[in-house]
């Protein structure tokens, strides 16, 4: 298990005493892996063509001397001032067509040949010098790729991308973007510009294609970065760190990670949940952490890496509250339980100046191993040292929820429904909740992944759906799968053009219904549905449904669609399809999905009886179940093991009742 984090010795080159202390503190903190060089370009190449690698040579040797490993970063995330000054084409241009000044980070032009050449060259030098060093574990490409550039170079690249996508046919493009609307038809490629608040931003097809282009151009930039690394170090794995947006930990929207995942050897991501906030319970937030972990793990169906987190507070939330005692261990073990093979922090040593000098770190400004945060990091390290056999183990699931970046983009761009209540990823989290509460493993997959391994596939709010996806959902259900779809699904195709002539005929065949209209409610509006003799509250969206051949499971109670279907079920060949026409309260989700859990014989990997707020997650290999029992409440909780298990940390055999303290985690193993 990797334990450590972002280490920036380049900030302390004038303090050899600090660098010496770092090595001592690494051993005391039970850390073993360090991401080095992420923003070090100015230290590596202070002037164009003048290189200073000696300090990095020394760091490699120091870390190697204690048995540590280095995740070596390429430095493109922040460039030296001389590079911006000498080659202004590398500066990003924003959507309002304003060229940015030098400064900040993550703000280069994605297309600039100069910047691509410069990054490829410095990367080659790093690979030549450190590619065969025994401490080198992995390449960390740039840092948190994101954002877009609207300069002339990028406009040209975008037009070339469009020519390729639309077979050099403006007629095809004009149809796909529905440009006759507002007389926006293009008759020359040079007329096309990227979306802009001072230009075109109302063509949804253009907006969607721009986002696709930015993803492809970012991947192209990344692929340029790794050319020398693949050539010189073909056996060293490569990653780049993905992100999620707080406070709800929704997948980062700047890039389609489902595409990017195909180009990395391992998924890694930076997790910064707002623990101990004042608007939700610890368990509610833990559920959201579980969801995003299961999405990023499922991208490659293999363990991922937690590349960044904080051992205590961050510096960029609205309120930067410290992790309470025990929370760093609990939150770290949750990451491991959901598939991570690492706990890596930002930052190892707290910066003395600039914007992140107050961001949490393993080593604080006091330079002491005696403070609470350092001691809790050391405890995480001691725990991880006992979990080496968990590395590489999987989390097999029979249930999947489908998340789609392009659908998210299109739905957010749609000028309809209600902007504040679309909440696509939060809706997926609501459907995920019942399975998390029942400790049932879930894969959060994308539309291109294989549906066949699953008994149950849940597809909420799939507003954008292609013919290919419809066909694959049809095959999944016909072959015996159980499919759940909701309101605001099947509205547009991959060009963000609406389907005409009613709901897609294959969707009508699968579900035995046709949605006729969607009623969008004001945030304070409420309705209700009756389901199995119980009344459940409904808000935000209600679909008026025409039943063809389906069975009615629930009906609306009020408004002009009172006594009409709200939830339906339909036998389709060997499978079954449910359509949920309204946004319903959490208790409906629990009751509905508990019925499917029973019908489909879905179960936890290893059953542990517990109360609300305790999560039990497991990883498996052929011989063992590694079970993480986690108390995400502020109270003591009773859990019960009906079978004997071995506590990995103590070696004790546990059975029957066990009282857990608040924020406590117990890790046990069940041998098959």
From Swiss-Prot:
Annotated GO MF terms: beta-galactosidase activity; metal ion binding
Binding site for substrate: 105, 143, 316, 356-359
The keyword Metal-binding appears for this protein: yes
EC numbers on record: 3.2.1.23
Regulation (activators, inhibitors): Inhibited by zinc, cobalt and copper ions.
Record keywords: Glycosidase, Hydrolase, Metal-binding, Zinc
UniProt name for this protein: Beta-galactosidase GanA
Gene coding for it: ganA
């Amino acid at each position: 298990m990797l334990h450590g984090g972002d280490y920036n010795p380049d900030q302390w080159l004038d303090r050899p005493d600090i660098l010496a202390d770092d090595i001592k503190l690494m051993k005391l903190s039970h850390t073993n892996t360090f991401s080095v060089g992420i923003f070090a370009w100015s230290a590596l190449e202070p002037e164009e063509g003048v290189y200073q690698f000696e300090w990095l040579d020394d760091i490699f040797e120091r870390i190697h001397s204690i048995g540590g490993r280095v995740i070596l970063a390429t430095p493109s995330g922040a460039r030296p001032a001389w590079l911006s000054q000498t080659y202004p084409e590398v500066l990003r241009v924003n959507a309002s067509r304003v060229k940015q000044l030098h400064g900040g980070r993550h703000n280069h032009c994605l297309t600039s040949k100069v910047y691509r050449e410069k990054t490829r060259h410095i990367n080659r030098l790093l690979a030549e010098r450190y590619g065969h060093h025994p401490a080198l574990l992995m390449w960390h490409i740039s840092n948190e790729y994101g954002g877009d550039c609207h300069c002339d170079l990028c406009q040209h690249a975008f037009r070339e991308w469009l020519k390729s996508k639309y077979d050099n046919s403006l007629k095809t493009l004009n149809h796909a973007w529905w440009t006759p609307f507002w007389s926006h038809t293009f008759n020359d490629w040079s007329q096309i510009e990227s979306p802009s608040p001072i230009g075109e931003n109302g063509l949804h097809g253009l907006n969607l294609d721009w986002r696709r282009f930015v993803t492809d151009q970012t991947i192209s930039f990344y692929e340029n970065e790794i050319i020398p690394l693949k050539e010189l170090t073909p056996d060293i794995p490569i990653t780049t760190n993905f992100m999620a947006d707080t406070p709800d930990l929704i997948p980062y929207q700047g890039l389609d990670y489902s595409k990017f995942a195909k180009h990395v050897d391992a998924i890694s991501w930076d997790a910064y949940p707002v623990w101990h906030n004042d608007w939700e319970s610890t368990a509610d937030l833990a559920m959201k952490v579980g969801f995003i972990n299961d999405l990023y793990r499922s991208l490659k169906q293999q363990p991922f890496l937690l590349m960044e987190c904080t051992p205590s507070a961050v510096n960029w939330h609205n309120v930067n509250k410290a992790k309470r005692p025990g929370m760093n261990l609990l939150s770290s073990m949750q990451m491991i339980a959901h598939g991570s093979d690492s706990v890596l922090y930002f930052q190892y040593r707290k910066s003395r100046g600039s914007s992140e000098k107050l961001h949490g770190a393993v080593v604080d400004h006091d330079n002491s191993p005696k403070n609470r945060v350092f001691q809790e990091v050391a405890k995480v390290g001691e725990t991880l040292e006992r979990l080496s056999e968990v590395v590489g183990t999987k989390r097999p699931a029979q249930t999947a929820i489908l998340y789609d970046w392009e659908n998210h983009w299109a739905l957010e761009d749609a000028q309809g429904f209600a902007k504040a209540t679309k909440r696509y990823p939060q809706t997926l989290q609501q459907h995920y909740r019942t399975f998390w509460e029942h400790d049932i493993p879930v894969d959060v997959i994308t539309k291109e992944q294989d549906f066949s391994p699953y008994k149950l596939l849940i597809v909420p709010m799939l507003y954008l759906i292609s013919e290919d996806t419809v066909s694959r959902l049809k095959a999944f259900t016909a072959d015996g799968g159980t499919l759940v779809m909701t309101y605001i699904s099947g509205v547009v195709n991959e060009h963000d053009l609406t389907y005409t002539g009613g709901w897609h005929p294959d969707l009508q065949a699968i579900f035995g219904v046709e949605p006729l209209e969607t009623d969008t409610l004001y945030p304070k509006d409420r309705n209700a549905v009756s389901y199995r003799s119980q009344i459940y509250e409904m808000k935000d969206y209600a679909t008026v449904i025409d039943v063809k051949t389906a069975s009615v499971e629930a009906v609306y109670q009020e408004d002009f669609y009172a006594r009409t279907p709200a939830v339906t079920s339909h036998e389709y060949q060997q499978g079954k399809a449910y359509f949920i026409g309204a946004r319903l309260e959490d208790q409906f989700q629990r009751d509905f999905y508990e019925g499917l859990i029973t019908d489909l014989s879905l179960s936890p990997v290893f059953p542990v009886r517990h109360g609300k707020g305790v999560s039990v997650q497991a990883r498996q290999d052929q011989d063992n179940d590694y079970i993480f029992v986690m108390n995400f409440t502020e109270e003591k909780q009773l859990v019960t093991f009906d079978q004997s298990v071995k506590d990995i940390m103590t070696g004790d055999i546990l059975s029957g009742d066990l009282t857990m303290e608040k924020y406590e985690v117990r890790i046990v193993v069940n041998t098959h």
